[in-house]
C-alpha cells in the first residue's frame, strides 16, 4: 500500500516543497518505497476564510496563479485551508476568497472545510472541489466520526487524539480507512483544553489581516495595531518547540508505525504539520518521515542549502 503524505504549505514553504517533490522524482532511491506527495495544503495571504494558522501579508495575482500551476504541473493538488472558526454567513461574500476558489477550481485541487454553511456554499458555487473534513472540528466521538463518512468527503482528517489509540482506530471499518487522514506530528499537547480557544484567536487574527489595506499588507504604511499581535502573544509554549520536542507525546506517530502498523491496518493518508514552523523544523519532519536513514544527512543538507531559481 502506498503511503500518501499531505505537506505544508503552499505559500510559506512553497519553494521547499517544490524542491522536495522534484527530488523524489529525480532521486527516488533517497526515499522510502511507495510514497507519494498527495497534496500541499495551506492558503494565500490574507484570505479571510483561512484557518488553523494565521497568515498576513499580500499575495499578488501572478504569485497565486504561478504557485497553483507549479504544484499542479507536478501532479500535486493544492489544498486550501478554509477553516477559520470565526466565519459567519456574511463572510461568504468575501471577494478574495471567492476569487481564490475560482482560479483553483479544476477538479483536482481541494478544500479543507469545517463550517457547514461554508461547505454548502462551496458545493453550490464551486462544485468541482473535492472536500476534506478538517481536524479543526475536534471530533473524538466515534458515532460523530461515522456521521462524517456518510458525507461525500474525499478524506476525513482525524482529531490528533485518535493517534496511537489502536483500540479506537481498530473500530473504524476497514472500507473507510482509506478515507482517513492522520496528523502524525501534532505540536499540540495531547487533549489540550485550550485548543479551541487558540483556533479562535488565530481566526480573529486572520480576520484582522484580511481587513488591512493593500498599503498595510505591502508594509508601505504601518498599521495602528499589528493584526497578528493576539496570535503571536497567545500563551502556548508549544509554538516554540522543535520537531524533536514533540516526539515524546503519546499522539506522535513514529516513522516505524507509519510504515508498519498504520499501513498494515489500511491507513495510508498522513498529514505533516508545519505551516508556519521554521524551515529547519519542516525539513527535519520530511527527513524523518520520508527519507531512508542512509540518505538523511545528504537530503537534509541539500534542502537547507537549496536556493530557488528566480
Where is each model-derived feature located?
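Solvent-exposed alpha-helices and their adjacent loops that cap or buttress functional pockets
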Residues: 148-150
Amino acid at each position: 500500500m502506498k503511503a500518501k503524505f499531505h505537506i505544508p504549505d503552499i505559500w510559506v514553504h512553497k519553494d521547499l516543497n517544490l524542491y522536495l517533490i522534484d527530488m523524489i522524482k529525480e532521486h527516488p532511491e533517497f526515499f522510502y518505497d511507495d510514497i507519494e506527495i498527495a497534496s500541499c495544503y495551506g492558503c494565500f495571504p490574507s484570505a479571510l476564510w483561512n484557518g488553523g494558522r494565521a497568515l498576513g501579508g499580500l499575495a499578488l495575482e501572478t504569485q497565486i496563479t504561478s504557485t497553483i500551476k507549479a504544484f499542479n504541473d507536478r501532479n500535486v493538488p493544492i489544498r486550501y485551508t478554509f477553516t477559520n472558526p470565526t466565519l459567519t454567513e456574511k463572510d461568504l461574500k468575501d471577494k478574495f476568497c471567492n476569487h481564490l476558489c475560482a482560479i483553483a477550481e479544476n477538479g483536482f485541487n481541494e478544500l479543507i472545510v469545517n463550517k457547514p454553511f461554508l461547505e454548502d456554499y462551496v458545493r453550490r458555487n464551486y462544485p468541482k472541489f473535492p472536500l476534506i473534513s478538517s481536524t479543526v472540528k475536534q471530533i473524538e466521538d466515534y458515532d460523530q466520526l461515522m456521521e462524517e463518512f456518510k458525507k461525500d468527503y474525499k478524506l476525513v482528517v482525524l482529531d490528533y487524539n485518535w493517534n496511537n489509540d489502536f483500540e479506537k482506530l481498530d473500530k473504524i471499518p476497514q472500507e473507510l480507512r482509506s478515507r482517513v487522514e492522520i496528523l502524525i506530528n501534532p505540536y499540540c499537547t495531547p487533549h489540550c483544553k485550550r485548543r479551541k480557544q487558540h483556533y479562535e484567536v488565530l481566526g480573529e487574527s486572520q480576520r484582522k489581516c484580511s481587513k488591512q489595506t493593500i498599503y498595510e499588507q505591502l508594509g508601505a504604511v504601518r498599521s495602528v495595531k499589528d493584526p497578528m499581535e493576539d496570535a503571536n502573544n497567545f500563551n502556548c509554549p508549544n509554538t516554540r518547540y522543535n520537531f524533536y520536542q514533540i516526539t515524546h507525546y503519546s499522539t506522535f506517530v513514529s516513522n516505524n508505525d507509519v510504515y508498519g502498523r498504520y499501513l498494515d491496518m489500511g491507513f495510508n493518508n498522513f498529514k505533516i504539520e508545519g505551516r508556519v514552523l521554521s524551515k529547519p523544523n519542516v525539513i527535519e519532519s520530511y527527513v524523518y518521515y520520508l527519507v531512508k536513514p542512509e540518505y538523511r544527512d545528504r537530503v537534509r543538507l541539500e534542502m537547507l542549502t537549496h536556493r530557488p531559481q528566480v
